[in-house]
């Protein structure tokens, strides 16, 4: 049975989608069967793996409101499978309020196909609302990207409070899968200090490999490619492959 991991941080700009996209590609490259569920209305993970949001047969919004099946919605790419999103998903937060088991719509959908994958990543929106609650109820665990910059720990207290609430009331299996340090700048003492502080807060959960600041990571999405393909020898690509190996050891 595959593991379902929600990639979540309510603070924007921390490398959440970049991490979801590139770990999907790196694990696929390593021979794992991976699905990336784009559950963010911005749909950047969808375009980041080369899909045109204008030409989708179905999308995850239609899945959670019951108008399409997961099997008919998944798109297959050379970088991994994608359950794509569009801006339509923004309306789901309202529509889900009127359906049965609103917090479990994504979980019910993913349970039907989880045996087909080694890992299912969910790219969550950068907020703590109904779409994110759906993601946390669907997941076995969470992966938290944390940028190595000032205010890095801002919002993590709220996220951990939400995690405890969801675990207690909605999804008792939910755990922390890992913490990924992103935007690390080895030229500054500050990045090192932030990394040390995060490791102190999450003992045993922070990946040894950190994701550096790297221009190729910023360029790759505009080409619809993961950095592991856009520039496979770049520091960003090497770092995500190394982090993927750490994940493989935990599977």
Where are these regions (language model features)?
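P-loop NTP-binding core
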Residues: 1-251
């Amino acid at each position: 049975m595959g593991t379902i991991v929600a990639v979540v941080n309510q603070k924007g700009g921390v490398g959440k989608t970049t991490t979801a996209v590139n770990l999907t590609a790196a694990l696929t490259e390593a021979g794992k069967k991976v699905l990336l569920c784009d559950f963010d209305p911005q749909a950047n993970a969808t375009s980041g793996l080369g899909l045109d949001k204008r030409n989708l047969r179905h999308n995850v919004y239609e899945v959670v409101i019951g108008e399409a099946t997961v099997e008919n919605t998944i798109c297959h790419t050379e970088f991994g499978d994608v359950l794509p999103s569009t801006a339509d998903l923004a309306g789901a937060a309202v529509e889900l309020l009127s359906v049965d088991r609103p917090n479990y719509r994504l979980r019910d959908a993913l349970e039907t196909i989880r045996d087909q994958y080694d890992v299912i990543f969910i790219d969550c929106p950068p907020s703590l609302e109904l779409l994110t609650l759906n993601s946390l109820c669907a997941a076995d665990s969470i992966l938290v990207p944390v940028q190595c910059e000032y205010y890095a720990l801002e919002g993590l207290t709220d996220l951990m409070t939400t995690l405890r609430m969801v675990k207690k009331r909605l999804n008792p299996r939910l755990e922390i899968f890992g913490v990924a340090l992103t935007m690390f700048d080895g030229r500054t003492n500050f990045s090192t200090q932030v990394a040390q502080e995060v490791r102190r807060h999450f003992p045993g959960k922070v990946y040894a490999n950190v994701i550096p600041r790297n221009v190729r990571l910023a360029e790759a999405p505009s080409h619809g490619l993961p950095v592991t393909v856009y520039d496979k020898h770049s520091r960003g690509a090497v770092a995500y492959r190394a982090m993927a190996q750490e994940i493989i050891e935990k599977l």
